[in-house]
Curated annotation (Swiss-Prot):
Regulation: Allosterically activated by GTP. Inhibited by UTP.
UniProt keyword annotation of Transmembrane helix present: no
Protein name per UniProt: Uridylate kinase
Subunit structure of this chain's protein: Homohexamer.
InterPro entries: AceGlu_kinase-like_sf, Asp/Glu/Uridylate_kinase, Glu/AcGlu_kinase, Uridylate_kinase, Uridylate_kinase_bac
Keyword ATP-binding: yes
NCBIfam families registered for this protein in UniProt: pyrH_bact
């Protein structure tokens, strides 16, 4: 087994990652495979925080004519559903897991309290952050960057459908070029599809590296933590 590059990580999953080929809802086989990969990190002594998107349940911008604020709050509820699903999968494997939400839902989750989240991580518990930042107009990418800064994560592990960052869509263009490493400024100036600009800027300001990799094989989560070069790293360079 290789040496762990990171002590504390923030795993960012899209909601679609939980949906699998269905594209909608939650595929519990996939949730379980992700949970098994996260358990491996915990067993290696790595502290894991996670943020899950909500696009498998609700895509706010697809709500044509709907008030943006209302749509965003619906998205926050969707992320909380996903957080509970992932918590259930992890706990079925014996991994102590806490869900903390930015909007209070005391019957099902803890409210987000930074000091409590840090304490959970130090005790080896996985902490899943739900409901985004609790504010409309901010994406779950931004929530992941914000929580990563707050819990002092060493890196954001950004799980995607593609195996890194390309200069154009590799699904549409055969000549798409993959980057092994990029700076935050290059991502922002070239408008590359990593995180949205708010999240990228937050990572840049707080010097949090972003490691982009494909989740087609959940084992990749462990591989990137052990330093295998299978994705794209975004950092100060």
């Amino acid at each position: 087994m290789g040496t762990c590059k990171y002590k504390r990580v923030m795993l960012k999953l899209s909601g679609e990652a939980l949906a699998g080929e269905n594209g909608f809802g939650i595929d519990f086989n996939i949730a379980m495979n992700i949970a098994k990969a996260v358990k491996e990190l915990v067993d290696m002594g790595i502290e894991v925080g996670a943020v899950v998107g909500g696009g498998n349940i609700w895509r706010g911008r697809s709500g044509e004519g709907m008030d943006r604020t209302t749509a965003d709050y619906m998205g926050m509820l969707a992320t909380s559903i996903n957080a509970l699903a992932l918590q259930d999968s992890l706990e079925s494997l014996g991994v102590d897991t806490r869900v903390q939400t930015a909007i209070e839902m005391k019957e099902i989750a803890e409210p987000y309290i930074r000091r409590r989240a840090m304490r959970h991580l130090e005790k080896g518990r996985v902490v899943i952050f739900g409901a985004g930042t609790g504010n409309p107009y901010f994406s779950t990418d931004t929530a992941a960057a914000l929580r990563a800064a707050e819990i002092e994560a060493d890196v954001i592990l950004l799980a995607k459908k593609v195996d890194g960052v390309y200069d154009k869509d590799p699904h549409k263009y055969d000549d798409a070029k993959k980057y092994d490493e990029l700076s935050y400024i290059e991502v922002l100036e070239q408008g590359l599809q990593v995180m949205d600009s708010t999240a990228t800027s937050l990572c840049m300001d707080n010097n949090i590296p972003i490691l982009v990799f494909a989740l087609d094989n959940p084992e990749n989560i462990k591989k990137v933590v052990l330093g295998e070069n299978i994705g794209t790293i975004v950092s100060k360079k």
